């Protein structure tokens, strides 16, 4: 869950987001080491009186500053490619939900059910109940079973949108005429909030996303009540 003045990423709720957090820390450590080395060299050059250097033809130095950046890039690229392929891999999803972006709301269709679909609009500020979040609550939440692989098919009816839920590590563009897909799996129940992350018009800020992850038995009761 996000909180005011938050500096870091939200707590991970899915395996993919946990991998992304590890990769973020891994990359940040490399950037910190490089920055420290550069600052040290700059301070050394500013405080040392250089009277003679033989750097006009230093093959060893050129070899080092060619090979070392290549190694650093490989150390960053390999974990990144691994996570990228993990995010694209979808095998035998337990449930498929089709998401369509509109100006300015989302519509959802549970394709495994004959007639389970609804629109999801933001609740206006004046209609919020005590404890509800401004600009983040919706009239119809997306209820999904936890600890199950769920495929999200995402597209748009009008302009470019982007379906994003940070705590699950999800951000997929909704493009008119194109069907993108992503997968999600939540390891614990709860409410997970997101928003449209592509500027899509005057009410772009009023397209929240709310996922309610529940045990399978609760999801079955909910789906039965919706049919």
From Swiss-Prot:
<keyword id="KW-0813">Transport</keyword>
<keyword id="KW-0999">Mitochondrion inner membrane</keyword>
<dbReference type="Pfam" id="PF00116">
    <property type="entry name" value="COX2"/>
</dbReference>
<dbReference type="GO" id="GO:0005743">
    <property type="term" value="C:mitochondrial inner membrane"/>
</dbReference>
<keyword id="KW-0812">Transmembrane</keyword>
<comment type="subunit">
    <text>Component of the cytochrome c oxidase (complex IV, CIV), a multisubunit enzyme composed of 14 subunits. The complex is composed of a catalytic core of 3 subunits MT-CO1, MT-CO2 and MT-CO3, encoded in the mitochondrial DNA, and 11 supernumerary subunits COX4I, COX5A, COX5B, COX6A, COX6B, COX6C, COX7A, COX7B, COX7C, COX8 and NDUFA4, which are encoded in the nuclear genome.</text>
</comment>
<feature type="binding site">
    <location>
        <position position="196"/>
    </location>
    <ligand>
        <name>Cu cation A1</name>
    </ligand>
</feature>
<keyword id="KW-0460">Magnesium</keyword>
<protein>
    <recommendedName>
        <fullName>Cytochrome c oxidase subunit 2</fullName>
        <ecNumber>7.1.1.9</ecNumber>
    </recommendedName>
</protein>
<dbReference type="InterPro" id="IPR008972">
    <property type="entry name" value="Cupredoxin"/>
</dbReference>
<dbReference type="InterPro" id="IPR014222">
    <property type="entry name" value="Cyt_c_oxidase_su2"/>
</dbReference>
<keyword id="KW-0186">Copper</keyword>
<keyword id="KW-0472">Membrane</keyword>
<feature type="topological domain" description="Mitochondrial intermembrane">
    <location>
        <begin position="1"/>
        <end position="14"/>
    </location>
</feature>
<dbReference type="Pfam" id="PF02790">
    <property type="entry name" value="COX2_TM"/>
</dbReference>
<feature type="binding site">
    <location>
        <position position="200"/>
    </location>
    <ligand>
        <name>Cu cation A2</name>
    </ligand>
</feature>
<keyword id="KW-0479">Metal-binding</keyword>
<keyword id="KW-0496">Mitochondrion</keyword>
<feature type="binding site">
    <location>
        <position position="198"/>
    </location>
    <ligand>
        <name>Cu cation A2</name>
    </ligand>
</feature>
<feature type="topological domain" description="Mitochondrial matrix">
    <location>
        <begin position="46"/>
        <end position="59"/>
    </location>
</feature>
<dbReference type="InterPro" id="IPR001505">
    <property type="entry name" value="Copper_CuA"/>
</dbReference>
<comment type="function">
    <text>Component of the cytochrome c oxidase, the last enzyme in the mitochondrial electron transport chain which drives oxidative phosphorylation. The respiratory chain contains 3 multisubunit complexes succinate dehydrogenase (complex II, CII), ubiquinol-cytochrome c oxidoreductase (cytochrome b-c1 complex, complex III, CIII) and cytochrome c oxidase (complex IV, CIV), that cooperate to transfer electrons derived from NADH and succinate to molecular oxygen, creating an electrochemical gradient over the inner membrane that drives transmembrane transport and the ATP synthase.</text>
</comment>
<dbReference type="InterPro" id="IPR045187">
    <property type="entry name" value="CcO_II"/>
</dbReference>
<comment type="similarity">
    <text>Belongs to the cytochrome c oxidase subunit 2 family.</text>
</comment>
<feature type="transmembrane region" description="Helical; Name=II">
    <location>
        <begin position="60"/>
        <end position="87"/>
    </location>
</feature>
<dbReference type="GO" id="GO:0045277">
    <property type="term" value="C:respiratory chain complex IV"/>
</dbReference>
<keyword id="KW-0679">Respiratory chain</keyword>
<dbReference type="InterPro" id="IPR034210">
    <property type="entry name" value="CcO_II_C"/>
</dbReference>
<feature type="transmembrane region" description="Helical; Name=I">
    <location>
        <begin position="15"/>
        <end position="45"/>
    </location>
</feature>
<keyword id="KW-0249">Electron transport</keyword>
<dbReference type="GO" id="GO:0042773">
    <property type="term" value="P:ATP synthesis coupled electron transport"/>
</dbReference>
<dbReference type="GO" id="GO:0004129">
    <property type="term" value="F:cytochrome-c oxidase activity"/>
</dbReference>
<feature type="binding site">
    <location>
        <position position="196"/>
    </location>
    <ligand>
        <name>Cu cation A2</name>
    </ligand>
</feature>
<feature type="binding site">
    <location>
        <position position="207"/>
    </location>
    <ligand>
        <name>Cu cation A1</name>
    </ligand>
</feature>
<dbReference type="InterPro" id="IPR011759">
    <property type="entry name" value="Cyt_c_oxidase_su2_TM_dom"/>
</dbReference>
<feature type="binding site">
    <location>
        <position position="204"/>
    </location>
    <ligand>
        <name>Cu cation A2</name>
    </ligand>
</feature>
<dbReference type="InterPro" id="IPR036257">
    <property type="entry name" value="Cyt_c_oxidase_su2_TM_sf"/>
</dbReference>
<feature type="binding site">
    <location>
        <position position="200"/>
    </location>
    <ligand>
        <name>Cu cation A1</name>
    </ligand>
</feature>
<keyword id="KW-1278">Translocase</keyword>
<feature type="topological domain" description="Mitochondrial intermembrane">
    <location>
        <begin position="88"/>
        <end position="227"/>
    </location>
</feature>
<keyword id="KW-1133">Transmembrane helix</keyword>
<feature type="binding site">
    <location>
        <position position="161"/>
    </location>
    <ligand>
        <name>Cu cation A1</name>
    </ligand>
</feature>
């Amino acid at each position: 869950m996000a909180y005011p003045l938050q500096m870091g990423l939200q707590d991970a709720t899915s395996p993919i987001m946990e991998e992304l957090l590890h990769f973020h820390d891994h990359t940040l450590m490399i950037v910190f080491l490089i920055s420290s080395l550069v600052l040290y060299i700059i301070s050394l050059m500013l405080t040392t009186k250089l009277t003679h250097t033989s750097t006009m033809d230093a093959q060893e130095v050129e070899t080092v500053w060619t090979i070392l950046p290549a190694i650093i890039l490989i150390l960053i690229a390999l974990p990144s490619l691994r996570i990228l392929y993990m995010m694209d891999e979808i095998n035998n999803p337990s449930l498929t939900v089709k998401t369509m972006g509109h100006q300015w709301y989302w519509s959802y269709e549970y394709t495994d059910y004959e007639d389970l679909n609804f629109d999801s609009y933001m609740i206006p500020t004046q209609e919020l109940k005590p404890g509800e979040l401004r600009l983040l609550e919706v009239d119809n939440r997306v209820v999904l079973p936890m600890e199950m692989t769920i495929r999200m098919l995402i597209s748009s009816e009008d302009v470019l949108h982007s379906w994003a839920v940070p705590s699950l590590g999800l951000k997929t563009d909704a493009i008119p005429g194109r069907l993108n897909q992503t997968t999600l799996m939540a390891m614990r129940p709860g409410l997970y909030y997101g928003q449209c992350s592509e500027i899509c018009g005057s009410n772009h800020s009023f397209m929240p996303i709310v996922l309610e992850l529940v045990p399978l038995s609760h999801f079955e009761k909910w789906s039965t009540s919706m049919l």
